[in-house]
Swiss-Prot record:
Pathway assignment: Lipid metabolism
Catalysed reactions listed for this entry: an epoxide + H2O = an ethanediol
Function (record text): Catalyzes the hydrolysis of epoxide-containing fatty acids. Active in vitro against trans-1,3-diphenylpropene oxide (t-DPPO), epoxyeicosatrienoic acids (EETs) including 8,9-EET, 11,12-EET and 14,15-EET and the linoleic acid metabolites 12,13-epoxy-9-octadecenoate (12,13-EpOME) and 9,10-epoxy-12-octadecenoate (9,10-EpOME).
Catalytic residues in the record: 152, 263, 319
Entry keyword set: Hydrolase, Lipid metabolism
Reported consequences of knocking out the gene: RNAi knockdown of both ceeh-1 and ceeh-2 results in the accumulation of 9,10-EpOME and 12,13-EpOME.
Protein name per the record: Epoxide hydrolase 2
Gene Ontology BP annotations: lipid metabolic process
Domain of life per record: Eukaryota
Domain AB hydrolase-1 as annotated: residue spans: 78-323
EC number(s) per entry: 3.3.2.10
Length: 355
């Protein structure tokens, strides 16, 4: 049965990739017929002022040079923040501003993003390398007392960091991504989650996703953050200048290929040994309950894979929770990092595991 189950998964994945890629190709072809070449003209956007007045640094890892922004006292407890797709360090701007008075705040650009190096091969974006980047970053900078905060793809990576290198971090803050084993449970039992995951299959394809993202003045990127379905609900927290910052980063040559390669190598991720599936550091999961991409059931199911885990549902917030409701996110993070003062706020549910 194992062979046939694996064969079915391969066929199913290939079929969905074909369907979504064909749909995207037909849409782009239609746009070419109706709007002409102008639709596909690529623009490189200037760097806005909002990206300039920060403390930018680089560190040389074994295989890449990584860019990061650092704010706050050098001797403070470390808050290390890891962004998702399609984001970059600036997605943590509200947390950098809030916590810089008490913590050594660091927000990185993951490999392939912004001014961090962009390896050319798809296999260079395997989860093994992504986890290793975080491990090396922590060890080379000799970071101690680390709270690791992560969103989206950053959370996919940091769940693994917490499982494989639990000695490097004290606490883990996860924004809108379930534990990988919890995601598999939700995906297998929920048709709604499988439908929400359509983009994963589209992004497996070569070239077409890049064309779609960079065409039409990057309207696809705008829709992700400002659209009615998936976008940030509290629009005042994502300004025109913020949108320009995103376009500036992802309009650079090669600016979309590296991030998309995360998806292209996703199914080659090494299996996590069962004995390591339980996360040992304390975990806080923050979850915007209007996530267009991930079912909130995954957050609750994640508790069983953690030794000590709390889940805070944030009502009226999108997938981009730390940008959408930064004040609440900051309060929850602050209370979690100062464990003695932690408590749920209002009517937001709290779960705690008993492992």
């Amino acid at each position: 049965m194992g062979f046939f189950a694996d064969l079915f998964k391969v066929v199913y994945s290939t079929w969905r990739q074909y369907i979504y890629t064909t749909g995207a190709l037909l849409t782009l072809t239609w746009k070419w017929f109706t709007e002409g070449n102008e639709y596909f003209v690529e623009h490189v956007y200037p760097e806005p002022e909002c990206l300039k007045n920060w403390n930018h640094k680089f560190v040389q890892l074994k295989n890449i040079r990584m860019h990061y922004v650092e704010e706050g006292p050098a001797d403070g407890d470390v808050l290390l923040m890891v962004h998702g797709f399609p984001e970059f360090w600036y997605s943590w701007r509200f947390q950098l501003e809030h916590f810089k008075h008490t913590h050594r705040c660091i927000a990185i650009d993951m490999r392939g993003y912004n001014t961090t190096d962009r390896p050319s091969g798809i296999s260079d974006y395997n989860l093994t390398h992504l986890v290793e980047d975080i491990r090396q970053f922590i060890e080379i900078l000799e970071l101690k007392r680390v709270t690791l905060a992560a969103h989206d793809w950053g959370a996919i990576v940091c769940w693994r960091v917490a499982m494989l290198h639990s000695n490097l971090i004290d606490r883990l803050v996860i924004c809108n991504v379930p534990h990988p084993f919890a995601f598999f449970e939700v995906y297998n039992m929920s048709k709604e989650q499988r439908n929400k995951s359509w983009y994963i299959y589209l992004f497996q394809s070569q070239y077409i996703p890049e064309i779609a993202m960079r065409s039409n003045k990057m309207k696809m990127l705008e829709a992700m953050f400002r659209g009615s379905k998936a976008g940030i609900r509290n629009s005042e927290n994502f300004t025109d200048e913020d949108m320009l910052a995103w376009k500036h980063v992802f309009s650079q040559p090669g600016g979309t290929t590296g991030p998309l390669n995360y998806y292209r190598d996703l199914f080659n991720a090494p299996a996590i040994p069962r004995k390591l599936q339980i996360v040992q550091p304390k975990v806080l999961i923050l979850w915007g309950d209007e996530d267009a991409f991930l079912d909130k059931k995954g957050a609750e199911l994640s508790v069983q894979f953690c030794r000590d885990c709390r889940v805070q549902m944030i009502r009226g917030a999108s997938h981009w929770v730390q940008q959408d409701q930064p004040q609440l996110v900051n309060v929850y993070m602050e209370q979690f990092m100062n464990e003695d003062s932690y408590r749920p706020i209002g009517e937001i549910k709290t779960f705690k595991s008993h492992l």
